[in-house]
A protein has these predicted regions:
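Extended alpha-helical scaffold and adjacent linker segments that couple domains
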Residues: 1-245
């Protein structure tokens, strides 16, 4: 018998996903990433966690260690001292708002996303949002049972991929410090990478402890040695002014 073929005039599900992903606004992608970042929880040794601050005013100036997760648009590239992440971190470190210098600058650490990995993450988010829109429009798209199953499976996979790649993308720990042997007035930066499958905050906390960027407890003798190196470096006495009567 003669074989018969027929063609479905509807676009394939994958074609619909690709088309929708290309039409998703950048602002929607950033909003989805920030929404997921805001699910991060504060962990010791940090007294505060500040996620995607809109300005330096959003980060308190207090005597307690704080971790700042920079916005998805404030990315970092290896060895680039003027990256968007560094520009944002320096602003928060130096200021509390537009007119107030920050006092407790030694209480802040920052985590930034890698520029290249962020580009990949944004594509993952576009696919996730595209699958989500298809699930929301499944009735108007007249999806059959097989297509509904494919949509649900693909949406779950896309969701998990975004979560995993979000943890990978936020891989730069920006640590401000001063070199006591050089110029104590000039802030310098260490920028180690933090990797692993743990949460962004957990990875940052472990690295901060390992590198002694944050020291929750310090032995009295070690503190004395550190103070001695500053107090008696160039003199064997300290001047004391007479009290005013």
């Amino acid at each position: 018998s003669r074989s018969r073929y027929w063609y479905d005039t509807r676009p394939t599900l994958r074609k619909t996903v690709t088309d929708r992903a290309s039409q998703i606004a950048d602002a929607d992608v950033v909003r989805e990433i920030e929404t997921r970042l805001r699910k991060c929880k504060k962990e010791s040794p940090f007294a505060g966690l500040h996620i995607c601050p809109a300005s330096s005013l959003d980060v308190p100036d207090e005597q307690a260690a704080r971790l700042v997760l920079l916005r998805p648009t404030e990315t970092h590239t290896v060895n680039k001292v003027d990256s968007a992440a560094m520009t944002a971190a320096v602003d928060v470190l130096n200021n509390r708002g537009s007119n107030t210098p920050r006092i407790y600058r030694n209480m802040l650490l920052f985590v930034a996303a890698d520029a290249g990995l962020m580009n990949d993450l944004q594509q993952d988010v576009r696919l996730y949002l595209a699958w989500q829109s298809i699930q929301n429009d499944r009735e108007s798209l007249n999806l059959d049972a097989a297509q509904n199953r494919e949509t649900e499976s693909s949406l779950r996979a896309a969701h998990d991929t975004v979560d995993a790649h979000l943890r990978e993308a936020y891989c730069w720990l920006l640590i401000p410090y001063v070199d006591k042997a050089a110029d104590v007035k000039t802030v310098q930066w260490e920028m180690p990478r933090i990797g692993g499958d743990e949460s962004i905050v957990t990875k940052a906390a472990k690295k901060a402890r390992t590198d002694e960027a944050v020291i929750p407890r310090w032995a009295p003798m070690l503190l004395k040695m550190e103070l001695d190196s500053l107090l008696w470096a160039s003199s064997d006495h300290l001047p004391v002014s007479a009290p005013c009567l």
